[in-house]
């Protein structure tokens, strides 16, 4: 009977987000702004992010604005700065610059115009601290380590079971729980290779140095702008953060061995060890490494390249960000792809919320599955391309030919390819993505 689809006592649409990292909180902010009932379940005691830097493209910032303008406020109030402004700060355009890190000249090899505020960089911990203030009190629950997900049938709520013995009942679940996602393990099985990230055979020495020290090592122009130092089997990137008081450093090296500890992606290292990998590189770059603390960390680069997820959603469960498509950081835009995910999922769930208002739980549950199916259809190909491309550009940065004067011309031919790949990330048409997602959702619902 048609009347059986109407339920005036229907509860608000409830979404459980597993993971309180940057993508999870941004997604929650977008949903809250659209009147959707949201809970974020974070396994840690509080919000914790490493102090390393991260950057967002102008496109990603525009996606943030569509989700909730308060997210952009949080970004800029946390000390975000353009990463690589024009020479002597005379212009507001951002540039990505590649320089010769191996030879003494430190010659600029290529420059790519990212536009006005093309990239904005911040410290992860400071951004997350500001982001959390965007959410109303009570949205986030900490110390909630996901144990199991119970899916009874299509008409009932999804139940989240936590390690502390508590439960949560929600209409749908979004896994934003990062590279070691428990939600992903639920979808594919704990023993499946699709459920776990795999070593890319690269690791990084990461840290922050003061702007004063960076200037003494590199000169003011390089210290205050983003530069990628390329060379054989390694590369180093740096850019300013924290209102230009600090410089974020990431030195990536190739590793033919397997990562020794699959339970931890971070291991101890020393400054001297890092400098050993760059022993034959130019003095300025080695001076940068010399300003790192004596005891530093070695970060393994794991991703989903070897076993990409066959799907990002099933029924009323969906994956976003690193939980769906963890990538190595060589494009510097992994979080940007996650923000695209958050915008797409938010707009689709808002459509579910509006189009099923007053209708039965059967209709709503079917609509959620249709929305997540649409998300999978429009997001998976681009996200998996990004995972592949992140590996590819690292190979270009670390070509052995950089060290061979007779083969350098071959290495330098890589920049047109890098430009094309970068533009595919920077100039993504998110409005067309949203239009396609809504059209697919409505088609799936027969409307």
Swiss-Prot record:
Gene disruption: observed consequences: Impairs the production of tropolones but leads to the accumulation of the intermediate 3-methylorcinaldehyde.
State the Gene3D superfamilies in the record: FAD/NAD(P)-binding domain
**GO CC annotation, single:** membrane
Q: Name one GO molecular function term.
A: FAD binding
* Any single Pfam family the record assigns to this protein: FAD_binding_3
The record's subcellular location field reads:
Membrane
Q: Please give a single GO biological process term from the UniProt record.
A: secondary metabolite biosynthetic process
**Cofactor list:** FAD
User: In the Enzyme Commission scheme, what number(s) does this protein have?
Assistant: 1.-.-.-
Q: What task does this protein carry out?
A: FAD-dependent monooxygenase; part of the gene cluster that mediates the biosynthesis of the tropolone class of fungal maleic anhydrides. Within the pathway, tropB catalyzes a synthetically challenging asymmetric oxidative dearomatization reaction to convert 3-methylorcinaldehyde into a hydroxycyclohexadione. The pathway begins with the synthesis of 3-methylorcinaldehyde by the non-reducing polyketide synthase (PKS) tropA. 3-methylorcinaldehyde is the substrate for the FAD-dependent monooxygenase tropB to yield a dearomatized hydroxycyclohexadione.
Q: Which family does it belong to?
A: Belongs to the paxM FAD-dependent monooxygenase family.
What is this protein identified as?
A: FAD-dependent monooxygenase tropB
Protein species of origin: Talaromyces stipitatus (strain ATCC 10500 / CBS 375.48 / QM 6759 / NRRL 1006)
Query: What gene name is listed for this protein?
Result: tropB
């Amino acid at each position: 009977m048609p009347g059986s689809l109407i339920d005036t006592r229907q509860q608000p649409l409830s979404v459980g987000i597993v993971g309180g990292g940057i993508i999870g909180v941004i997604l929650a902010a977008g949903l809250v702004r659209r009147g959707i009932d949201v809970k974020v379940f974070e396994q840690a005691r509080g919000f914790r992010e490493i102090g390393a830097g991260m950057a967002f493209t102008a496109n990603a910032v525009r996606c943030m604005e569509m989700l909730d303008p308060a997210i952009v406020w949080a970004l800029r109030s946390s000390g975000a700065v353009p990463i690589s402004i024009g020479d002597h700060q005379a212009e507001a355009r951002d540039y990505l610059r590649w320089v010769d890190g191996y030879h003494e000249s430190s010659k600029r090899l290529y420059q790519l115009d990212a536009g006005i505020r093309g990239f904005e960089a911040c410290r992860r911990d400071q951004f997350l601290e500001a982001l959390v203030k965007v959410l109303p009190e009570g949205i986030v629950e900490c110390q909630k380590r996901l144990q199991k997900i119970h899916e009874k049938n299509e008409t009932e709520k999804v139940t989240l079971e936590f390690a502390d013995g508590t439960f949560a009942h929600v209409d749908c679940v979004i896994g934003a729980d990062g590279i070691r996602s428990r939600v992903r393990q639920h979808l594919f099985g704990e023993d499946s290779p699709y459920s776990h990230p795999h070593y890319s055979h690269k690791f990084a020495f990461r840290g922050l140095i003061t702007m004063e020290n960076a200037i003494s090592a590199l000169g003011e122009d390089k210290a205050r702008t983003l530069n990628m130092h390329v060379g054989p089997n390694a590369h180093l990137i740096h850019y300013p953060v924290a209102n230009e008081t600090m410089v974020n450093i990431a030195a990536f090296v190739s590793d033919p061995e397997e990562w020794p500890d699959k339970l931890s992606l971070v291991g101890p290292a020393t400054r001297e060890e890092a400098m050993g990998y760059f022993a034959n590189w130019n003095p300025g770059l080695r001076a940068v490494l010399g300003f790192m603390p004596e005891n530093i960390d070695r970060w393994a680069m794991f991703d989903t390249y070897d076993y990409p997820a066959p799907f990002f959603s099933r029924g009323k469960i969906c994956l976003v960000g690193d939980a769906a498509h963890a990538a190595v950081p060589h494009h510097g835009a992994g979080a940007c792809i996650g923000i695209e995910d958050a915008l797409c999922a938010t707009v689709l769930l808002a459509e579910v919320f509006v189009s099923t208002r007053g209708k039965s739980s059967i209709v709503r549950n079917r609509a959620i599955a249709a929305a997540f199916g649409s998300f999978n259809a429009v997001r998976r190909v681009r996200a998996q391309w990004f995972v592949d491309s992140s590996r590819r550009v690292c190979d270009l940065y670390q070509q052995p030919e950089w060290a061979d004067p007779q083969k350098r011309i071959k290495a330098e031919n890589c920049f047109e390819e890098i430009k094309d790949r970068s533009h595919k990330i920077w100039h993504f048409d998110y409005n067309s993505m949203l239009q396609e997602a809504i059209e697919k959702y409505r088609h799936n619902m027969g409307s």
